[in-house]
Amino acid sequence: MAIIGLGTDIVEISRIEAVVERSGEKLARRILSPAEWQHYQQHQQPIRFLAKRFAVKEAAAKAFGTGIRNGLAFNQFEVVNDALGKPTLRLHQRAAELAAELGVKSLHVTLADERRYACATVIIES
């Protein structure tokens, strides 16, 4: 296997909070998959949840080398956790097509947050 992409993003959680205060749930609906939306609505700290998901999706877009454009959208990257809570990505629509075109075999996600920041790194292997 070879690393074919690496992306990192850091988000100031208060920035996400300000956007949600200003525009309601518009940001969350644009970023989250339907399953993530359900978790967001029930989460004890929804702003922190949203900030972490945003960081992962930005990192994924960077790792793929595309950014969010040309048919690629935030909600096509879905953060899911295994039985131990380890995050990974489930890809949908154009994101899944792009992964197939690139020969992606594995996606690795690491996620961290502190009081003010959420940070994520995504590694793509072929």
Swiss-Prot record:
Entry GO terms, CC: cytoplasm
The prosthetic group or cofactor this protein requires is: Mg(2+)
UniProt-listed Enzyme Commission number(s): 2.7.8.7
Q: Which reaction does it catalyse?
A: apo-[ACP] + CoA = holo-[ACP] + adenosine 3',5'-bisphosphate + H(+)
Per the annotation, which location comes first and is thus the protein's main one? cytoplasm
Kindly provide the name given to this protein in its UniProt entry.
Holo-[acyl-carrier-protein] synthase
Q: Mind listing the UniProt keywords for this protein, alphabetically? A: Cytoplasm, Fatty acid biosynthesis, Fatty acid metabolism, Lipid biosynthesis, Lipid metabolism, Magnesium, Metal-binding, Transferase
Per the similarity annotation, which family is this?
Belongs to the P-Pant transferase superfamily. AcpS family.
Question: One GO molecular-function annotation for this sequence?
Answer: holo-[acyl-carrier-protein] synthase activity
Compartments annotated for it: namely: Cytoplasm
| Pfam family, any one | ACPS
Organism, per UniProt?
Yersinia enterocolitica serotype O:8 / biotype 1B (strain NCTC 13174 / 8081)
